[in-house]
């Protein structure tokens, strides 16, 4: 539930209400990342919500967002949302919209650059700060405030001269969060998406992506100490959980998209500190638009 309008000038847009902040910030506006099924790609880098009060759809919070266009290519976005960890995923509090359980305020700021042409692109540089007091990892003490920064890129790198609409886009994601209180220290993502892979399939896509989630070294120290105190061996794990994903978006009808998908997860126990076999995941996404 939100209200949005331009204010004073067409360049200034304001949005107020109870809303998911990830709908306006932290992701690529082009929607390229939702050619994948894994939430590590589709949405925003996972360490934003994993290590701060950032919330993505369907979780909503009270807040305000301001966008200002410096030019057709450059835009600044600033927002402020209340942080309420008890409301995330708690259906019993779905209609408790007040700020009673607020622990702080998360303030993101984004600089956005977009250019059109034969090879269009979108670039986002962002920073966020959560004022909540939270427990410091590996300590009984608390830390006042936690933040992070990110860089998101979507750039067309090839366009067919013989088939209109056949374009290859490359994307990149980098996000770093505070090591004092975030279980994720860094997230890296990269990949390509080919639009119109076949002449008779103008709205189909082929997407290939790689993601790497790096656990906080402090969390690993805590796990190693717990294993030592218990007299057990700590597994010889890499320092990250990794993801490789391949998907095909099939536009069956103007309103129905089918997305068969294959994912390979490398070291899925990197965050829990347990030795788990690599996992092969096969899925199918069905998306209907009315």
Feature locations, PLM:
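Outer membrane beta-barrel
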Residues: 1-85, 182-186, 196-222
